[in-house]
Amino acid sequence: MTESVSKPVRPRAAVILAAGQGTRMKSPTPKVLHRLAGRTLLDHAIDAAEGLGCERIIVVVGAHSPQVGESARKRLGPDATVIQDPPLGTGHAVLAAKDALADFHGDVVVTYADCPLTTAPVIAPLFDLITHVAHVAVLGFEAQNPTGYGRLILAPGHVLLRIVEEKEADLATKQVKHCNSGVLAADRAVLFDLLANVRNDNAKGEYYLTDVVGLAHERHLSTRTAFAPEASVQGVNAQAELAAAEAVWQQNRRKALMVDGVTMPAPDTVHLAWDTQIAGGAVVEQFVVFGPGVSVASGAVIKAFSHLEGAVVGEGALIGPYARLRPGAEIGPDAHIGNFVEVKKVKVGAGAKANHLSYLGDGSVGEKANIGAGTIFCNYDGFEKFETHVGKGAFIGSNSALVAPVRVGDGAMTGSGSVITKDVEDGALALSRADQTSKAGWATKFRAIKQAQKDKKKDKKA
Protein backbone atom coordinates (compact mmCIF):
# COMPACT_ATOMS: atom_id res chain seq x y z
CA MET A 1 0.00 0.00 0.00
CA THR A 2 1.19 3.51 -0.82
CA GLU A 3 1.53 5.64 2.33
CA SER A 4 0.85 9.35 1.82
CA VAL A 5 1.76 12.47 3.77
CA SER A 6 0.26 15.95 3.93
CA LYS A 7 0.00 18.11 0.81
CA PRO A 8 3.32 19.76 -0.17
CA VAL A 9 3.89 23.47 0.51
CA ARG A 10 6.22 23.72 -2.51
CA PRO A 11 6.43 21.56 -5.64
CA ARG A 12 8.35 18.34 -5.07
CA ALA A 13 10.37 16.04 -7.31
CA ALA A 14 12.25 12.82 -6.66
CA VAL A 15 15.42 11.41 -8.15
CA ILE A 16 15.52 7.65 -7.56
CA LEU A 17 18.95 6.05 -7.96
CA ALA A 18 18.64 2.64 -9.62
CA ALA A 19 21.89 2.30 -11.55
CA GLY A 20 23.71 -0.13 -9.26
CA GLN A 21 25.05 -3.40 -10.63
CA GLY A 22 23.51 -5.55 -7.89
CA THR A 23 26.12 -8.28 -8.38
CA ARG A 24 25.76 -9.61 -4.84
CA MET A 25 22.21 -10.72 -5.60
CA LYS A 26 23.75 -13.34 -7.93
CA SER A 27 20.59 -13.37 -10.01
CA PRO A 28 19.76 -12.74 -13.68
CA THR A 29 17.00 -10.45 -12.45
CA PRO A 30 18.21 -6.87 -11.85
CA LYS A 31 18.40 -6.15 -8.13
CA VAL A 32 15.70 -3.48 -8.03
CA LEU A 33 13.28 -5.71 -9.96
CA HIS A 34 13.33 -8.33 -7.23
CA ARG A 35 10.09 -8.34 -5.29
CA LEU A 36 9.15 -7.59 -1.71
CA ALA A 37 5.55 -8.33 -0.72
CA GLY A 38 4.82 -9.07 -4.37
CA ARG A 39 6.04 -5.66 -5.61
CA THR A 40 9.40 -4.72 -7.12
CA LEU A 41 11.87 -2.77 -5.02
CA LEU A 42 11.75 -0.06 -7.67
CA ASP A 43 7.98 0.21 -7.38
CA HIS A 44 8.26 0.54 -3.60
CA ALA A 45 10.60 3.51 -4.14
CA ILE A 46 8.20 5.05 -6.65
CA ASP A 47 5.34 4.50 -4.19
CA ALA A 48 7.29 6.50 -1.59
CA ALA A 49 7.89 9.35 -4.04
CA GLU A 50 4.23 9.45 -5.03
CA GLY A 51 3.21 9.31 -1.37
CA LEU A 52 5.34 12.41 -0.78
CA GLY A 53 3.40 14.24 -3.47
CA CYS A 54 6.27 14.40 -5.95
CA GLU A 55 4.96 15.73 -9.25
CA ARG A 56 8.13 14.74 -11.10
CA ILE A 57 9.93 11.42 -10.60
CA ILE A 58 13.18 10.69 -12.42
CA VAL A 59 14.77 7.23 -12.19
CA VAL A 60 18.52 7.05 -12.83
CA VAL A 61 19.36 3.71 -14.43
CA GLY A 62 22.50 2.00 -15.67
CA ALA A 63 23.19 1.05 -19.27
CA HIS A 64 23.75 -2.53 -18.09
CA SER A 65 20.09 -3.08 -17.06
CA PRO A 66 17.64 -1.95 -19.76
CA GLN A 67 14.87 -3.87 -17.98
CA VAL A 68 14.99 -1.39 -15.10
CA GLY A 69 14.42 1.53 -17.42
CA GLU A 70 11.60 -0.30 -19.17
CA SER A 71 9.89 -0.98 -15.85
CA ALA A 72 10.18 2.66 -14.75
CA ARG A 73 8.91 4.04 -18.06
CA LYS A 74 6.00 1.61 -18.11
CA ARG A 75 4.76 3.08 -14.85
CA LEU A 76 5.88 6.71 -15.08
CA GLY A 77 6.00 7.50 -18.78
CA PRO A 78 8.63 7.80 -21.53
CA ASP A 79 10.55 10.71 -19.98
CA ALA A 80 10.96 9.19 -16.52
CA THR A 81 14.46 7.75 -16.88
CA VAL A 82 18.00 8.97 -17.45
CA ILE A 83 21.11 6.84 -17.90
CA GLN A 84 24.24 7.10 -15.79
CA ASP A 85 27.08 5.84 -17.97
CA PRO A 86 29.75 5.32 -16.82
CA PRO A 87 28.90 4.92 -13.11
CA LEU A 88 31.06 7.41 -11.24
CA GLY A 89 29.33 7.63 -7.87
CA THR A 90 26.11 8.87 -6.32
CA GLY A 91 26.79 12.54 -6.98
CA HIS A 92 27.44 11.78 -10.63
CA ALA A 93 24.21 9.76 -10.74
CA VAL A 94 22.11 12.65 -9.43
CA LEU A 95 23.78 15.04 -11.90
CA ALA A 96 22.52 12.76 -14.68
CA ALA A 97 19.01 13.97 -13.80
CA LYS A 98 19.87 17.68 -14.05
CA ASP A 99 18.61 18.24 -17.59
CA ALA A 100 15.44 16.24 -16.93
CA LEU A 101 14.61 18.66 -14.10
CA ALA A 102 15.79 21.84 -15.82
CA ASP A 103 12.25 23.24 -16.00
CA PHE A 104 11.33 22.18 -12.45
CA HIS A 105 11.28 24.77 -9.68
CA GLY A 106 10.88 23.32 -6.22
CA ASP A 107 12.37 20.82 -3.78
CA VAL A 108 14.09 17.59 -4.80
CA VAL A 109 14.61 14.45 -2.75
CA VAL A 110 17.19 11.83 -3.68
CA THR A 111 16.19 8.26 -2.80
CA TYR A 112 17.29 4.72 -3.62
CA ALA A 113 15.49 1.97 -5.50
CA ASP A 114 16.93 -0.71 -3.23
CA CYS A 115 15.46 0.67 0.02
CA PRO A 116 11.87 -0.62 0.06
CA LEU A 117 11.26 0.21 3.73
CA THR A 118 12.06 3.90 3.28
CA THR A 119 8.47 5.03 2.87
CA ALA A 120 6.92 8.46 2.46
CA PRO A 121 6.36 9.03 6.21
CA VAL A 122 10.03 8.16 6.85
CA ILE A 123 11.26 10.72 4.30
CA ALA A 124 8.70 13.48 4.95
CA PRO A 125 10.61 15.20 7.81
CA LEU A 126 13.30 16.23 5.31
CA PHE A 127 10.80 18.41 3.46
CA ASP A 128 9.73 19.98 6.74
CA LEU A 129 13.36 20.88 7.41
CA ILE A 130 14.07 22.46 4.02
CA THR A 131 10.76 24.31 4.15
CA HIS A 132 11.51 25.96 7.49
CA VAL A 133 15.14 25.80 8.64
CA ALA A 134 17.54 24.17 6.17
CA HIS A 135 18.90 24.47 2.66
CA VAL A 136 20.01 20.82 2.69
CA ALA A 137 18.50 18.02 4.79
CA VAL A 138 19.81 14.48 5.21
CA LEU A 139 18.07 11.41 6.60
CA GLY A 140 20.20 9.73 9.24
CA PHE A 141 19.93 6.82 11.63
CA GLU A 142 21.76 5.50 14.66
CA ALA A 143 23.42 2.22 13.71
CA GLN A 144 24.00 -0.67 16.07
CA ASN A 145 27.04 -1.50 13.95
CA PRO A 146 28.11 1.54 11.90
CA THR A 147 30.82 -0.27 9.93
CA GLY A 148 30.49 0.45 6.23
CA TYR A 149 28.28 3.52 6.55
CA GLY A 150 29.09 7.17 6.03
CA ARG A 151 29.25 8.98 9.40
CA LEU A 152 27.30 12.14 10.20
CA ILE A 153 29.40 14.77 11.93
CA LEU A 154 26.90 16.84 13.89
CA ALA A 155 26.80 20.03 15.91
CA PRO A 156 24.11 20.64 18.56
CA GLY A 157 20.55 20.82 17.25
CA HIS A 158 21.12 18.17 14.56
CA VAL A 159 23.14 20.70 12.57
CA LEU A 160 25.05 18.62 10.02
CA LEU A 161 28.66 19.71 9.44
CA ARG A 162 29.76 17.04 6.99
CA ILE A 163 29.46 13.38 6.04
CA VAL A 164 32.56 11.20 6.11
CA GLU A 165 32.56 7.99 4.08
CA GLU A 166 33.89 4.84 5.74
CA LYS A 167 37.00 4.70 3.57
CA GLU A 168 37.84 8.31 4.36
CA ALA A 169 37.17 8.07 8.12
CA ASP A 170 39.87 8.15 10.77
CA LEU A 171 39.70 6.03 13.92
CA ALA A 172 37.81 8.66 15.94
CA THR A 173 35.25 9.20 13.19
CA LYS A 174 34.64 5.46 12.94
CA GLN A 175 33.40 5.50 16.54
CA VAL A 176 30.46 7.74 15.53
CA LYS A 177 27.18 5.82 15.37
CA HIS A 178 25.13 8.51 13.61
CA CYS A 179 25.08 7.27 10.03
CA ASN A 180 23.93 8.43 6.62
CA SER A 181 21.00 6.70 4.92
CA GLY A 182 21.85 8.39 1.62
CA VAL A 183 18.48 10.11 1.35
CA LEU A 184 18.90 13.86 0.88
CA ALA A 185 16.61 16.79 0.07
CA ALA A 186 17.27 20.33 -1.15
CA ASP A 187 15.94 22.99 -3.45
CA ARG A 188 16.67 21.97 -7.06
CA ALA A 189 18.85 24.99 -7.81
CA VAL A 190 20.82 24.59 -4.58
CA LEU A 191 21.30 20.85 -5.11
CA PHE A 192 22.66 21.04 -8.64
CA ASP A 193 24.80 24.08 -7.90
CA LEU A 194 26.48 22.20 -5.08
CA LEU A 195 26.86 19.04 -7.16
CA ALA A 196 28.63 21.01 -9.88
CA ASN A 197 31.43 21.66 -7.38
CA VAL A 198 31.84 18.12 -6.05
CA ARG A 199 35.30 16.66 -6.73
CA ASN A 200 36.43 13.05 -7.00
CA ASP A 201 39.68 13.29 -5.04
CA ASN A 202 38.85 10.42 -2.71
CA ALA A 203 39.85 6.78 -2.23
CA LYS A 204 37.37 5.49 -4.82
CA GLY A 205 37.78 8.28 -7.36
CA GLU A 206 34.02 8.88 -7.35
CA TYR A 207 31.76 11.89 -7.03
CA TYR A 208 29.98 11.51 -3.69
CA LEU A 209 26.53 12.99 -3.20
CA THR A 210 27.44 13.32 0.47
CA ASP A 211 30.06 15.97 -0.34
CA VAL A 212 27.31 18.52 -0.98
CA VAL A 213 26.87 18.77 2.80
CA GLY A 214 30.42 19.98 3.38
CA LEU A 215 30.17 22.36 0.43
CA ALA A 216 26.90 23.76 1.79
CA HIS A 217 28.48 24.31 5.20
CA GLU A 218 31.43 26.13 3.59
CA ARG A 219 28.95 28.46 1.88
CA HIS A 220 27.15 29.11 5.15
CA LEU A 221 24.04 27.30 3.95
CA SER A 222 22.10 25.62 6.74
CA THR A 223 22.24 21.82 6.87
CA ARG A 224 20.13 19.64 9.12
CA THR A 225 19.47 15.97 9.85
CA ALA A 226 16.27 14.08 10.54
CA PHE A 227 16.60 10.65 12.11
CA ALA A 228 14.72 7.47 11.25
CA PRO A 229 14.76 3.96 12.77
CA GLU A 230 17.62 1.89 11.39
CA ALA A 231 15.29 -0.80 10.05
CA SER A 232 13.41 1.71 7.90
CA VAL A 233 16.47 2.77 5.89
CA GLN A 234 18.16 -0.56 5.29
CA GLY A 235 19.17 -1.25 1.72
CA VAL A 236 18.98 -4.55 -0.14
CA ASN A 237 22.21 -5.79 -1.71
CA ALA A 238 22.00 -9.57 -1.30
CA GLN A 239 19.34 -12.25 -1.10
CA ALA A 240 19.63 -12.52 2.68
CA GLU A 241 19.06 -8.77 3.00
CA LEU A 242 16.01 -9.03 0.76
CA ALA A 243 14.62 -11.74 3.04
CA ALA A 244 15.37 -9.60 6.10
CA ALA A 245 13.59 -6.60 4.57
CA GLU A 246 10.63 -8.81 3.69
CA ALA A 247 10.42 -9.97 7.30
CA VAL A 248 10.41 -6.39 8.60
CA TRP A 249 7.78 -5.30 6.07
CA GLN A 250 5.53 -8.28 6.87
CA GLN A 251 5.80 -7.70 10.62
CA ASN A 252 4.95 -4.01 10.27
CA ARG A 253 1.95 -4.68 8.04
CA ARG A 254 0.59 -7.48 10.23
CA LYS A 255 0.82 -5.24 13.29
CA ALA A 256 -1.03 -2.47 11.46
CA LEU A 257 -3.83 -4.85 10.47
CA MET A 258 -4.19 -6.15 14.02
CA VAL A 259 -4.36 -2.58 15.32
CA ASP A 260 -7.24 -2.09 12.87
CA GLY A 261 -9.10 -5.08 14.34
CA VAL A 262 -8.02 -8.06 12.24
CA THR A 263 -7.64 -11.26 14.26
CA MET A 264 -4.51 -13.32 13.58
CA PRO A 265 -3.91 -16.17 16.07
CA ALA A 266 -0.42 -16.79 14.64
CA PRO A 267 0.56 -13.60 12.81
CA ASP A 268 4.15 -14.63 12.06
CA THR A 269 2.82 -17.39 9.78
CA VAL A 270 0.69 -15.07 7.62
CA HIS A 271 2.23 -13.70 4.41
CA LEU A 272 0.74 -10.49 3.00
CA ALA A 273 1.08 -8.66 -0.30
CA TRP A 274 1.82 -4.97 -0.72
CA ASP A 275 -1.84 -4.14 -1.41
CA THR A 276 -3.67 -6.68 0.80
CA GLN A 277 -6.86 -5.17 2.23
CA ILE A 278 -8.39 -6.86 5.29
CA ALA A 279 -11.17 -5.18 7.22
CA GLY A 280 -11.38 -5.14 10.99
CA GLY A 281 -13.45 -8.04 12.29
CA ALA A 282 -12.00 -10.52 9.80
CA VAL A 283 -10.05 -13.57 10.99
CA VAL A 284 -6.92 -14.89 9.30
CA GLU A 285 -5.72 -18.24 10.61
CA GLN A 286 -2.28 -19.84 10.43
CA PHE A 287 -0.17 -20.15 7.28
CA VAL A 288 -2.35 -18.11 4.96
CA VAL A 289 -0.67 -16.56 1.89
CA PHE A 290 -2.00 -13.44 0.19
CA GLY A 291 -0.86 -12.59 -3.32
CA PRO A 292 -1.53 -9.15 -4.80
CA GLY A 293 -5.03 -7.83 -5.32
CA VAL A 294 -6.94 -9.34 -2.38
CA SER A 295 -9.72 -7.67 -0.41
CA VAL A 296 -11.32 -9.33 2.63
CA ALA A 297 -14.45 -7.90 4.25
CA SER A 298 -15.33 -7.76 7.93
CA GLY A 299 -16.54 -10.99 9.48
CA ALA A 300 -14.87 -13.21 6.89
CA VAL A 301 -12.73 -16.10 8.11
CA ILE A 302 -9.72 -17.27 6.13
CA LYS A 303 -8.83 -20.65 7.54
CA ALA A 304 -5.40 -22.22 7.71
CA PHE A 305 -3.21 -23.00 4.70
CA SER A 306 -5.31 -21.06 2.19
CA HIS A 307 -3.80 -19.14 -0.74
CA LEU A 308 -5.51 -16.04 -2.16
CA GLU A 309 -4.56 -13.73 -5.04
CA GLY A 310 -6.62 -11.26 -7.04
CA ALA A 311 -9.75 -12.19 -5.08
CA VAL A 312 -12.57 -10.43 -3.24
CA VAL A 313 -14.03 -12.06 -0.11
CA GLY A 314 -17.37 -10.78 1.17
CA GLU A 315 -18.67 -10.27 4.69
CA GLY A 316 -19.02 -13.42 6.74
CA ALA A 317 -17.57 -15.67 4.05
CA LEU A 318 -15.67 -18.78 5.12
CA ILE A 319 -12.58 -19.72 3.11
CA GLY A 320 -10.61 -22.93 3.61
CA PRO A 321 -8.79 -24.60 5.12
CA TYR A 322 -6.55 -25.42 2.15
CA ALA A 323 -8.57 -23.32 -0.31
CA ARG A 324 -7.16 -21.49 -3.30
CA LEU A 325 -8.70 -18.31 -4.66
CA ARG A 326 -7.18 -17.16 -7.93
CA PRO A 327 -7.58 -13.87 -9.83
CA GLY A 328 -11.17 -12.98 -10.57
CA ALA A 329 -12.66 -14.97 -7.69
CA GLU A 330 -15.47 -12.99 -6.03
CA ILE A 331 -16.86 -14.71 -2.96
CA GLY A 332 -20.17 -13.29 -1.78
CA PRO A 333 -21.35 -12.68 1.78
CA ASP A 334 -21.66 -15.82 3.93
CA ALA A 335 -20.49 -18.07 1.10
CA HIS A 336 -18.32 -21.10 1.88
CA ILE A 337 -15.28 -22.21 -0.11
CA GLY A 338 -13.92 -25.27 1.64
CA ASN A 339 -10.91 -27.54 1.68
CA PHE A 340 -9.15 -28.25 -1.60
CA VAL A 341 -11.50 -26.04 -3.59
CA GLU A 342 -9.98 -23.81 -6.29
CA VAL A 343 -11.90 -20.81 -7.63
CA LYS A 344 -10.78 -18.74 -10.63
CA LYS A 345 -12.76 -15.97 -12.40
CA VAL A 346 -16.01 -17.09 -10.78
CA LYS A 347 -18.50 -14.93 -8.92
CA VAL A 348 -19.92 -16.96 -6.03
CA GLY A 349 -23.23 -15.63 -4.74
CA ALA A 350 -24.25 -14.96 -1.16
CA GLY A 351 -24.66 -18.08 0.94
CA ALA A 352 -23.46 -20.45 -1.79
CA LYS A 353 -21.31 -23.40 -0.76
CA ALA A 354 -18.52 -25.40 -2.35
CA ASN A 355 -17.14 -27.23 0.63
CA HIS A 356 -14.96 -30.02 -0.77
CA LEU A 357 -12.54 -30.96 -3.54
CA SER A 358 -13.78 -28.88 -6.48
CA TYR A 359 -12.53 -26.70 -9.33
CA LEU A 360 -14.66 -23.70 -10.27
CA GLY A 361 -13.16 -21.82 -13.19
CA ASP A 362 -14.76 -19.13 -15.40
CA GLY A 363 -18.42 -18.47 -14.66
CA SER A 364 -20.73 -17.92 -11.73
CA VAL A 365 -22.47 -19.68 -8.85
CA GLY A 366 -25.82 -18.26 -7.77
CA GLU A 367 -26.99 -17.41 -4.28
CA LYS A 368 -27.58 -20.38 -1.96
CA ALA A 369 -26.37 -22.86 -4.57
CA ASN A 370 -24.59 -26.00 -3.34
CA ILE A 371 -21.62 -27.45 -5.19
CA GLY A 372 -21.03 -31.09 -4.28
CA ALA A 373 -17.65 -32.65 -3.62
CA GLY A 374 -15.60 -33.40 -6.69
CA THR A 375 -17.40 -30.97 -8.99
CA ILE A 376 -15.40 -29.69 -11.94
CA PHE A 377 -16.11 -26.72 -14.19
CA CYS A 378 -14.60 -28.07 -17.44
CA ASN A 379 -13.72 -24.67 -18.89
CA TYR A 380 -10.94 -25.35 -21.40
CA ASP A 381 -10.90 -27.29 -24.67
CA GLY A 382 -7.19 -26.89 -25.25
CA PHE A 383 -7.65 -23.66 -27.21
CA GLU A 384 -10.29 -21.46 -25.57
CA LYS A 385 -11.90 -20.87 -22.18
CA PHE A 386 -15.69 -21.15 -21.79
CA GLU A 387 -18.05 -20.26 -18.95
CA THR A 388 -20.23 -22.30 -16.62
CA HIS A 389 -23.15 -20.69 -14.81
CA VAL A 390 -24.93 -22.32 -11.88
CA GLY A 391 -28.22 -20.67 -10.92
CA LYS A 392 -29.61 -19.56 -7.58
CA GLY A 393 -30.41 -22.40 -5.21
CA ALA A 394 -29.13 -25.04 -7.63
CA PHE A 395 -27.70 -28.31 -6.31
CA ILE A 396 -24.76 -29.91 -8.08
CA GLY A 397 -24.33 -33.54 -7.10
CA SER A 398 -20.95 -34.90 -6.09
CA ASN A 399 -18.48 -35.86 -8.80
CA SER A 400 -20.27 -33.83 -11.48
CA ALA A 401 -18.43 -32.50 -14.52
CA LEU A 402 -20.02 -29.38 -16.03
CA VAL A 403 -18.67 -29.05 -19.57
CA ALA A 404 -18.65 -25.39 -20.61
CA PRO A 405 -20.30 -23.52 -22.13
CA VAL A 406 -23.24 -24.65 -20.03
CA ARG A 407 -25.87 -23.28 -17.65
CA VAL A 408 -27.60 -25.03 -14.76
CA GLY A 409 -30.78 -23.12 -14.01
CA ASP A 410 -32.17 -21.71 -10.78
CA GLY A 411 -33.22 -24.45 -8.38
CA ALA A 412 -32.04 -27.18 -10.75
CA MET A 413 -30.18 -30.32 -9.67
CA THR A 414 -27.63 -32.65 -11.20
CA GLY A 415 -27.26 -36.27 -10.14
CA SER A 416 -23.99 -37.45 -8.67
CA GLY A 417 -21.45 -38.58 -11.23
CA SER A 418 -23.14 -36.76 -14.10
CA VAL A 419 -21.35 -35.17 -17.05
CA ILE A 420 -23.47 -32.16 -17.97
CA THR A 421 -22.94 -30.96 -21.54
CA LYS A 422 -26.29 -29.24 -22.18
CA ASP A 423 -28.13 -26.45 -20.38
CA VAL A 424 -30.40 -27.55 -17.53
CA GLU A 425 -33.63 -25.61 -17.21
CA ASP A 426 -34.81 -24.03 -13.97
CA GLY A 427 -36.06 -26.58 -11.43
CA ALA A 428 -35.06 -29.61 -13.51
CA LEU A 429 -33.01 -32.69 -12.58
CA ALA A 430 -30.24 -33.66 -14.99
CA LEU A 431 -28.74 -37.16 -15.00
CA SER A 432 -26.12 -38.56 -17.35
CA ARG A 433 -24.75 -41.89 -16.21
CA ALA A 434 -25.19 -45.55 -17.12
CA ASP A 435 -27.93 -47.54 -15.37
CA GLN A 436 -26.67 -49.62 -12.47
CA THR A 437 -26.87 -53.40 -12.86
CA SER A 438 -26.42 -56.00 -10.11
CA LYS A 439 -25.20 -59.58 -10.76
CA ALA A 440 -26.11 -61.81 -7.85
CA GLY A 441 -23.23 -63.89 -6.48
CA TRP A 442 -20.75 -62.60 -9.05
CA ALA A 443 -18.34 -61.14 -6.50
CA THR A 444 -18.31 -64.35 -4.43
CA LYS A 445 -17.57 -66.50 -7.50
CA PHE A 446 -14.87 -64.05 -8.65
CA ARG A 447 -13.06 -64.21 -5.32
CA ALA A 448 -13.23 -68.02 -5.27
CA ILE A 449 -11.72 -68.30 -8.75
CA LYS A 450 -8.94 -65.84 -7.96
CA GLN A 451 -8.12 -67.53 -4.65
CA ALA A 452 -7.90 -70.91 -6.36
CA GLN A 453 -5.51 -69.51 -8.96
CA LYS A 454 -3.37 -67.99 -6.24
CA ASP A 455 -3.26 -71.24 -4.24
CA LYS A 456 -2.27 -73.19 -7.34
CA LYS A 457 0.72 -70.90 -7.95
CA LYS A 458 1.83 -71.40 -4.33
CA ASP A 459 1.64 -75.20 -4.69
CA LYS A 460 3.87 -75.11 -7.81
CA LYS A 461 6.51 -73.04 -6.00
CA ALA A 462 6.47 -75.46 -3.08
Curated annotation (Swiss-Prot):
Catalyzes the last two sequential reactions in the de novo biosynthetic pathway for UDP-N-acetylglucosamine (UDP-GlcNAc). The C-terminal domain catalyzes the transfer of acetyl group from acetyl coenzyme A to glucosamine-1-phosphate (GlcN-1-P) to produce N-acetylglucosamine-1-phosphate (GlcNAc-1-P), which is converted into UDP-GlcNAc by the transfer of uridine 5-monophosphate (from uridine 5-triphosphate), a reaction catalyzed by the N-terminal domain. GO terms for biological process: cell morphogenesis; cell wall organization; lipid A biosynthetic process; peptidoglycan biosynthetic process; regulation of cell shape; UDP-N-acetylglucosamine biosynthetic process. It is found in: Cytoplasm. GO terms for cellular component: cytoplasm; membrane. It catalyses: alpha-D-glucosamine 1-phosphate + acetyl-CoA = N-acetyl-alpha-D-glucosamine 1-phosphate + CoA + H(+); N-acetyl-alpha-D-glucosamine 1-phosphate + UTP + H(+) = UDP-N-acetyl-alpha-D-glucosamine + diphosphate. Pathway: Nucleotide-sugar biosynthesis; UDP-N-acetyl-alpha-D-glucosamine biosynthesis; N-acetyl-alpha-D-glucosamine 1-phosphate from alpha-D-glucosamine 6-phosphate (route II): step 2/2; Nucleotide-sugar biosynthesis; UDP-N-acetyl-alpha-D-glucosamine biosynthesis; UDP-N-acetyl-alpha-D-glucosamine from N-acetyl-alpha-D-glucosamine 1-phosphate: step 1/1; Bacterial outer membrane biogenesis; LPS lipid A biosynthesis. NCBIfam families: glmU (TIGR01173), PRK14353.1 (NF010933). Residues 261-462 are annotated as: N-acetyltransferase. Keywords: Acyltransferase, Cell shape, Cell wall biogenesis/degradation, Cytoplasm, Magnesium, Metal-binding, Multifunctional enzyme, Nucleotidyltransferase, Peptidoglycan synthesis, Repeat, Transferase. Homotrimer. This is Bifunctional protein GlmU. Acetyl-CoA binds at A373, N379, Y380, S398, S416, R433. Its main location: cytoplasm. Binds 1 Mg(2+) ion per subunit. PANTHER family: BIFUNCTIONAL PROTEIN GLMU, NUCLEOTIDYL TRANSFERASE. Residues 1-239 are annotated as: Pyrophosphorylase. SUPFAM superfamilies: Nucleotide-diphospho-sugar transferases, Trimeric LpxA-like enzymes. Mg(2+) binds at D114, N237.
